Amino acid sequence: STDRGRTFTRYDGNPVLTSDRPDFRDPKVFYHDRTGRWIMVIAAGQAMEIHSSANLRSWRFESRFGEEYGAHGGAWECPDLFELPVEGEPGQTRWVMLCSLGVEDGSRVQYFVGDFDGRNFTPEDDPDEVKWMDFGRDHYATVTWSGAPDGRRIALGWMNNWAYANEVPSVTFRGSNTLPRELGLRRVGGELLLTSVPAREAEKLLGEPFAVPAFAVETEHN
């Protein structure tokens, strides 16, 4: 694309990267200023792989992360990797790795906090520690955007769960997008945790409050 993603011309040299690993999918690509290279983080079975490129066409494998960290169950997918400032600690930043996966109670998004040097992601968390991005059951496949006003990191997820996604009654769709969220990092009890609040632009959607008095739900309610 030469017009900031508004139109695309298919590249004749596709695919630019292949693998014999299972579930090799969901690439997230961003530019890493410190190394001057493009970084691709991509799901590969029960882990995430990191590749780098100078031109977006020729890719070099850099590292693999995840086999011995966090929760495992279904395939790891929908990776993301980004840098965030630490709230209340001027000049301090950390990198966050997002990972969506299916576990016993359905689909969830876990995250890891650490450092990234352009080749390796090094988590601060213990290998057996699991940090969930959301404790609700309907927030999955989260992706983030950079370039938002004021340097904010905006996240958007799929409001559904693979445990029942194919059985949710609907008309022409399965689930919907979540509200955009602004992400941050806050130290709580010495531990860095991911924070999220609705993006400030969502306030434009607010209207007058509407209250429904208490009532019993009967079988005829649909």
Regions found by a protein language model. Give the residues of each.
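Conserved Ser/Thr-centered positions that define the repeating blades of beta-propeller domains
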Residues: 1-2, 50-56
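Surface loop/turn signatures of beta-propeller and other carbohydrate-active proteins
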Residues: 5-31, 42, 60-83, 120-142, ...
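Residue-level detector of Asp-centered blade-edge/turn motifs that repeat once per structural unit
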Residues: 31-36, 83-91, 148-151
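Hydrophobic beta-strand segments that make up the repeating blades of beta-propeller
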Residues: 38-42, 95-97, 155
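Short glycine/acidic-enriched loop and turn motifs that connect beta-strands
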Residues: 46-47, 102-105, 162-163
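A short loop-to-beta-strand structural motif that recurs across blades of beta-propeller domains
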Residues: 47-49, 110
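Loop/turn-rich, solvent-exposed surfaces of beta-rich toroidal or solenoidal domains
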Residues: 87-113
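Beta-rich accessory regions
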Residues: 90, 110-222
